[in-house]
Amino acid sequence: MKTIVCFLTILILVSSCESKNKKVVIIPGPKGERPDIKVVEGPSTVEDDFCYDCVRRCMVKGVGFYFRSCKGFVCRCYYPFMGGYGP
């Protein structure tokens, strides 16, 4: 019964946070105890969205462009040299 209640609680938290762009972080507890559940909202979700858009832009640039990195809101794509390997 405890497992079902715990599962339904996690399911409700995840579904309610999906519409608000929040993340649910589940931290495993010690053996035999329930895990901690934390709802995180902040710049990490904004940066994740930016990096997702970055990957899409690299793919749209043209055939052969690949995603390289996304750090500090800087999107980097690269075009591989002859031989198929990038820098």
From Swiss-Prot:
Q: Hey, which family's this protein in?
A: Belongs to the DEFL family.
Query: What is the protein's name according to its record?
Result: Defensin-like protein 218
- Bilayer-spanning residue ranges: none
Q: Where in the cell is it found?
A: Secreted
Keywords assigned:
Antimicrobial, Disulfide bond, Fungicide, Plant defense, Secreted, Signal
State if ATP-binding is listed as a keyword. Answer: no
GO CC, sorted alphabetically, is:
extracellular region
Q: Which residues form the signal peptide?
A: 1-19
Tell me which Gene Ontology terms the entry assigns under biological process: defense response to fungus; killing of cells of another organism
Q: Listed disulfide bonds for this chain?
A: C51-C70, C54-C75, C58-C77
